[in-house]
Amino acid sequence: MDRLIHTPEGVRDVYNQECTKKLYLENQIEQVFHAFGYQDIETPTFEFFDVFGREVGTTPSRELYKFFDRDGNTLVLRPDFTPSIARAASMYFMEETMPIRLCYRGSSFVNSSSYQGRLKESTQMGVELLNDDSAMADAEIIAMTVKVMLDAGLTDFQISIGHVGFFQALAEEAALSEEVLNELKELISIKNHFGAEELLAKQNLRSDLFEALRDVPQLFGNAEILEKAKGLTRNPAAREALDRLATIYEIVKDYGYEKYVFFDLGLLSKFHYYTGIIFQAYTYGTGEPIVKGGRYDALLQHFGKKAPAIGFCTVMESLMNALERQKISLPIANTKTMLLYPDFLQPLAVKLANEHRSKGMDVALVCFARDKVLADYEEYGRKNQFGGIVYIQKSDSVLAINLSTGEVQPVEL
């Protein structure tokens, strides 16, 4: 019986007020996407395994939901939208060289370990900007991230921005083995400065290179940190990455959003497809980033189209948690009306409901049961987000009940 009424571990039902809030937020975010000129795209919930395979550098195989079709092909529930969008763009926009702006919403599925306490199905909304490798494109994506956070109702948040090219250039110069490199990435990701220093001390590096790599976990702060980082290395590729971040910051200032920007040169990702800037949006009330994104100029080539790209995704569950814990209310009005009627006035009730629906009102017809009283319907209405009740007592006697104030007024038909 438990399996009939309960959901599996890692997934949950969303209903009533929570569902209303979630849909409101999704519509707010979608308006931001459209305001910046992005067009909607839908991709399948499942794809061939190769779309998310190791070569793409997305979710580890053990965390994928895999199954077989009747022809024996291995299929995967999408864990990440970006490879799906890259595949679709490579198919439908192969010859397009002008910028392509796409936006999406839907569920993603990651079979994470139970002890991590994460949902295995989450709702993601995001954008992808293809065929544009400019700093302006990077800044546009950052500005959209800020706008999404603001329009969701958040005011106290920050966008942490890094550049994978900075660390990558230093690591390549140091010629670190893959094992050491992976361990160093892990230490930097958790800001373990001392662990990174101990590991690097065993690598027989030049003093300046040792110091630069050692300090990566501590290179976070405002725009001044970029100049500090530049003073640590003469590596051309590393300095180019820093210059790119500085240029992006100047454009973000044109948007008026610089106060939300924070630089973190130790920001790394488990997704290997990132090639340029990488960023995450944080606020109070959730341990996970609400928004994650970055530049992935080589990913589309895996699907046959050589094109630069940048994008981000918003994790709706993290956003909802943050709003709830910060006690931020959303301006959602209870606009539904309950049209309550006795059974002998059903034709009149249907006629009135249709008239009001044609005017754009949300009207639910409810027949007054003989074993109920008016107070039962008032309680039912409040629980189910009705704004008011129109109660047809007789063909010439109608009451309007405001469920927020309790005010009752007679009205004429």
Sequence positions of predicted segments:
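TRNA-binding/sensing appendages of the translation machinery
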Residues: M1-P83, A139, S160
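Short, conserved phosphate-binding/catalytic loop or strand-edge motifs used
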Residues: K120-M125, I161-A169
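Short, surface-exposed recognition loops or helix-turn segments adjacent to catalytic cores
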Residues: D156-G165, L184, F262-G266
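Hydrophobic mid-domain F-helix/FG-region of cytochrome P450s
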Residues: M144-D151, G165-A175
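Phosphate/dinucleotide-binding and metal-coordinating scaffold of catalytic cores
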Residues: T97-M98
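Positively charged, Gly/Ser-enriched RNA/tRNA-binding surfaces
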Residues: K21-V32, E47-F48, T82-F93, L102-L154, ...
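Acidic, His- and aromatic-enriched active-site or binding-groove loops in soluble protein domains
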Residues: E63-D69, L176-E197, L205, Y257
